[in-house]
């Protein structure tokens, strides 16, 4: 530890990022209660102004939106990152009666860190003793689902996915929604707890929720549900602190990150992860091989199964919800990458490839896969089977190495399912648009509809600094085709470690991609927010336009650059067209004119009817005697 690190006592000094705890404008946190009082599902309610009288003068119902920000945006909750978030799930876990509290950490490395006095000032101060399944028990959501049990977590996500859809319909918020094309997905008109159970039992969806992460607000990942996004955080050997990483977490979930992966490779990985998990209302994923490599000083050849196993237990006892495991990088696939333009670009993939070549043995993650499953089901950690041979350039897309590994991931998925362990599959990468659907179709075929989770894909390689856009295009497409979760890409991709601004930009970009995919799939209720914003735009309700958007701050700032006065917030134009050329203002004038013409036409028509009736009453004679 440096002198500066020794001087910092995080258990005394750590503070929440103040930007992350500000409520959104005109929004309030609401909770929808389930069948028991401790099932309280958070949503964000956006209140709207009334329609102006010259547009018909009506009341606009508030709009509910999916909320990943946890208690951070609830003004009634006091946030103290030194203590962590409130417990959401322990009562549910206790009621199932299949877990036990350990006397302490059981991993060797975890005990070593706990006993290191020098780390006391960096350590999260309120560490609980971990839980583990009782001997012979399986505590995975898939295991419960296959036994016909609807857990509290399943009910929770059903409420969360529905977003009070019936009430929205009754309020007239869904008068219009285009039919979608779901490419064979089975999206119901309403998400029920029983449907959630069926999808998890089938392996088509997962609820990543480690029994040691009771703070998590359950969410679901699957092709028949809302498309989710993941945001990556984590330190490197070159920088960032624990406090900065917690700030990135809270900032990311504010803008809509459904899960967060901690990809730390620098100092104090164990301590950083503890702070992140204790303060996270969303599932946390990791790549355990990164930390295992740090334990052998970065020498891949020195990795051994026993050390990796201890790392899995260490992280499972902290509460990691899903592990990226690169078990599909087999020895026979490595030579297939030799002629690639960019070779092996996955960090985990390159580590395992190097180990395989150095020992000329099969990947130990593959040979010990059943043992990994035993660990996963003891804590309900989900697999995210890593695509270690994903293409790192569009030139390498859909090659033999990539698809060979995908076939192996399908084989491993079926092994995980035999253990009732939840599983999703990671995907590319860099893929031109015309090859994206082939990726999705092959994944569905090889992995039997297990959820797909892709990094983009990036559709072109020519735009360093703008890869959030090159990948957002591919993300929207593959989300439409059936991908369940999209891993965000920031503007710093390939260039450097992202900061807070980069995190926000990446998340907003991917929220757009995910929502566009939901619309295209025809997810029930997906168009509610679009309809509300379009109506506000036509009625020149500027504040409602800002507040209904994914990023109210930026929308308001852009508007105010040229029209900063409050009077401009009720003006019937913006600076793009000005008062005389606003298409929506002109359209309204045309409507008013048409209404007047229609009124004249009605008067004329009534007069003609009266004359016709008089003609008939007078005998229908063309001429009358004078």
From Swiss-Prot:
GO BP annotation list: thiamine biosynthetic process; thiamine diphosphate biosynthetic process
The GO terms this record gives for MF are: 4 iron, 4 sulfur cluster binding; carbon-carbon lyase activity; zinc ion binding
Name the domain of life this protein comes from. Answer: Bacteria
Pathway assigned in UniProt: Cofactor biosynthesis; thiamine diphosphate biosynthesis
Q: How is the cofactor bound?
A: Binds 1 [4Fe-4S] cluster per subunit. The cluster is coordinated with 3 cysteines and an exchangeable S-adenosyl-L-methionine.
Q: Where does substrate bind?
A: 232, 261, 290, 326, 346-348, 387-390, 426, 453
Give, as one word, the top-level EC class: lyase
Q: Which UniProt keywords apply?
A: 4Fe-4S, Iron, Iron-sulfur, Lyase, Metal-binding, S-adenosyl-L-methionine, Thiamine biosynthesis, Zinc
Report biased composition (Polar residues) as residue ranges: 10-22
Q: Which Gene3D superfamilies match?
A: 6.10.250.620, Radical SAM ThiC family, central domain
Detail which positions bind [4Fe-4S] cluster.
574, 577, 582
Instruction: Give the EC number(s) under which this enzyme is classified.
Output: 4.1.99.17
**Binding positions for Zn(2+)?**
430, 494
GO CC annotations on file: cytosol
**Reaction(s) the record says it catalyses:** 5-amino-1-(5-phospho-beta-D-ribosyl)imidazole + S-adenosyl-L-methionine = 4-amino-2-methyl-5-(phosphooxymethyl)pyrimidine + CO + 5'-deoxyadenosine + formate + L-methionine + 3 H(+)
Per the record, a Pfam family?
Answer: ThiC_Rad_SAM
Annotated stretches, region: Disordered? 1-22
Q: Which cofactor does it need?
A: [4Fe-4S] cluster
Task: List the InterPro entries hit by this protein, alphabetically.
Answer: ThiC, ThiC-associated_dom, ThiC/Bza_core_dom, ThiC/BzaA/B
UniProt cross-references to PANTHER family, sorted A to Z:
PHOSPHOMETHYLPYRIMIDINE SYNTHASE, CHLOROPLASTIC, THIAMINE BIOSYNTHESIS PROTEIN THIC
Family membership: Belongs to the ThiC family.
- How is the subunit organization of this protein annotated in UniProt? Homodimer.
Stated role: Catalyzes the synthesis of the hydroxymethylpyrimidine phosphate (HMP-P) moiety of thiamine from aminoimidazole ribotide (AIR) in a radical S-adenosyl-L-methionine (SAM)-dependent reaction.
- Would you tell me the protein name for this molecule? Phosphomethylpyrimidine synthase
Organism (species): Pseudomonas putida (strain GB-1)
Q: What is the lineage of its organism?
A: Bacteria, Pseudomonadati, Pseudomonadota, Gammaproteobacteria, Pseudomonadales
């Amino acid at each position: 530890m440096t002198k500066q690190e020794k001087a910092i006592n995080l258990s005394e000094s750590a503070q929440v990022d103040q930007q992350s705890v500000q409520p959104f404008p005109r929004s309030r946190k609401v909770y929808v209660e389930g069948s028991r009082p401790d099932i309280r599902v958070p949503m964000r309610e956006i209140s709207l102004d009334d329609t102006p009288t010259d547009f018909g003068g009506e009341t606009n119902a508030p709009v509910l939106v999916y909320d990943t920000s946890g208690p951070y945006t609830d003004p009634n909750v006091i946030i103290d990152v030194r203590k962590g978030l409130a417990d959401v799930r322990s009562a549910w876990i206790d009621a199932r009666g299949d877990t036990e509290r350990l006397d302490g950490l059981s991993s060797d490395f975890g005990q070593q860190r706990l006993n290191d006095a020098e780390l006391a000032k960096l350590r999260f101060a309120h560490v609980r003793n971990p839980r583990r399944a009782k001997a012979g028990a399986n505590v995975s959501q898939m295991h419960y689902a296959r036994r016909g049990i609807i857990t509290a977590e399943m009910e929770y996500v059903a409420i969360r996915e529905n977003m009070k859809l019936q009430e929205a319909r009754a309020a007239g918020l869904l008068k219009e929604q285009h039919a979608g094309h779901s490419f064979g997905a089975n999206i119901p008109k309403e998400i029920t707890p029983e449907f959630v159970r069926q999808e998890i039992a089938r392996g088509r969806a997962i609820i990543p929720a480690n029994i040691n992460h009771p703070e998590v607000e359950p969410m679901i990942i699957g092709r028949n549900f809302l498309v989710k996004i993941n945001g990556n955080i984590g330190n490197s050997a070159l920088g960032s602190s624990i406090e900065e990483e917690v700030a990135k977490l809270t900032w990311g979930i504010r803008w809509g990150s459904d899960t967060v992966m901690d990809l730390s490779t620098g100092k104090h990985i164990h301590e950083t992860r503890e702070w992140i998990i204790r303060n996270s209302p969303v599932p946390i994923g990791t790549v355990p091989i990164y930390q295992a490599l740090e334990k052998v000083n970065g020498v891949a050849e020195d990795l051994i199964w026993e050390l990796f196993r201890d790392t899995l237990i260490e992280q499972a006892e902290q509460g990691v919800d899903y592990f990226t495991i690169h078990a599909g990088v087999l020895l026979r696939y490595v030579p297939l990458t030799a002629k690639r333009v960019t070779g092996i670009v996955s960090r985990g993939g390159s580590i395992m490839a190097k180990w395989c070549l150095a020992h000329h043995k099969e990947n130990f993650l593959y040979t010990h896969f059943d043992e990994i499953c035993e660990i996963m089901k003891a804590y309900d950690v989900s697999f995210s089977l890593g695509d270690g041979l994903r293409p790192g350039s569009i030139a390498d897309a859909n090659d033999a190495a990539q698809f060979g590994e995908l076939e192996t991931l399908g084989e491993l998925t079926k092994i995980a399912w035999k253990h009732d362990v939840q599983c999703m599959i990671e995907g590319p990468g860099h893929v031109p648009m015309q090859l994206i659907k082939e990726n999705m179709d092959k994944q569905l075929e090889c992995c039997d509809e297990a959820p797909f989770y892709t990094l983009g894909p990036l559709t072109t390689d020519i735009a360093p600094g703008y890869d959030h856009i090159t990948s957002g295009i591919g993300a929207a497409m593959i989300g439409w085709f059936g991908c369940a979760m999209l891993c965000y890409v920031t503007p710093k991709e390939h260039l450097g470690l992202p900061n807070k601004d980069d995190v926000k930009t990446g998340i907003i970009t991917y929220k757009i991609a995910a929502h566009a995919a939901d619309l295209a799939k025809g997810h029930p209720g997906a168009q509610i927010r679009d309809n509300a914003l379009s109506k506000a735009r036509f009625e020149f309700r500027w504040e409602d336009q800002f507040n209904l958007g994914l990023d109210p701050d930026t929308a308001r700032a852009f508007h105010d650059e040229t029209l900063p006065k409050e009077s401009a917030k009720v003006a019937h134009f913006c600076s793009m067209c000005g008062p005389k050329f606003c298409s929506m203002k002109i359209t309204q004038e045309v409507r008013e004119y048409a209404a007047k013409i229609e009124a004249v036409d009605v008067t004329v028509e009534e007069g003609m009817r009266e004359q016709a009736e008089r003609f008939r009453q007078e005998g229908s004679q063309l001429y009358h005697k004078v």
